[in-house]
Amino acid sequence: MARRRRAQTRKIDADPVYGSVVISKFINKLMYDGKKSKAENIFYKAMDLVKEKTGKDGLEAFNEAIENIKPRVEVKSRRVGGSTYQVPVDVRPDRQNSLAFTWLIDASRKRGGRSMIERLSNEIVDAIDGKGQAVAKRDTVHRMAEGNKAFAHFRW
């Protein structure tokens, strides 16, 4: 059923340590079973490890990693005359962040390591350096869009 208008976005408070709404959204995405304090604990300890490894401020390092993971374009399926085409479309800024968070968390969870704190910090450091699974996922999405550039005129 189509909506008459776009769903309203909830206002999310900034996190207490860095004062950033982006980090607050990331912590919410990281959270399992409503255990926010555990998610915050994992994130802040991972940021401490990132600070040790890179020497950069936690907020600065996190923002740089997210910028390197954000997709600029993605493909969406569009059915035209019995055929389905993968049409490249630009990604909205809020969706860019959402996808970057999801990819970073998924890559961290799949990564080998002792604790989620270490895995998350290692993935963030790799993302800053332009490598790691999350950046590879972004590159895959960009390659798909590049390969289907011929269908860009089907954009809606």
From Swiss-Prot:
<dbReference type="GO" id="GO:0015935">
    <property type="term" value="C:small ribosomal subunit"/>
</dbReference>
<keyword id="KW-0694">RNA-binding</keyword>
<dbReference type="GO" id="GO:0003735">
    <property type="term" value="F:structural constituent of ribosome"/>
</dbReference>
<dbReference type="GO" id="GO:0000049">
    <property type="term" value="F:tRNA binding"/>
</dbReference>
<dbReference type="Pfam" id="PF00177">
    <property type="entry name" value="Ribosomal_S7"/>
</dbReference>
<keyword id="KW-0687">Ribonucleoprotein</keyword>
<dbReference type="InterPro" id="IPR000235">
    <property type="entry name" value="Ribosomal_uS7"/>
</dbReference>
<keyword id="KW-0820">tRNA-binding</keyword>
<dbReference type="GO" id="GO:0019843">
    <property type="term" value="F:rRNA binding"/>
</dbReference>
<dbReference type="GO" id="GO:0006412">
    <property type="term" value="P:translation"/>
</dbReference>
<comment type="similarity">
    <text>Belongs to the universal ribosomal protein uS7 family.</text>
</comment>
<keyword id="KW-0689">Ribosomal protein</keyword>
<keyword id="KW-0699">rRNA-binding</keyword>
<dbReference type="InterPro" id="IPR005717">
    <property type="entry name" value="Ribosomal_uS7_bac/org-type"/>
</dbReference>
<dbReference type="InterPro" id="IPR036823">
    <property type="entry name" value="Ribosomal_uS7_dom_sf"/>
</dbReference>
<dbReference type="InterPro" id="IPR023798">
    <property type="entry name" value="Ribosomal_uS7_dom"/>
</dbReference>
<comment type="function">
    <text>One of the primary rRNA binding proteins, it binds directly to 16S rRNA where it nucleates assembly of the head domain of the 30S subunit. Is located at the subunit interface close to the decoding center, probably blocks exit of the E-site tRNA.</text>
</comment>
<comment type="subunit">
    <text>Part of the 30S ribosomal subunit. Contacts proteins S9 and S11.</text>
</comment>
<dbReference type="InterPro" id="IPR020606">
    <property type="entry name" value="Ribosomal_uS7_CS"/>
</dbReference>
<protein>
    <recommendedName>
        <fullName>Small ribosomal subunit protein uS7</fullName>
    </recommendedName>
</protein>
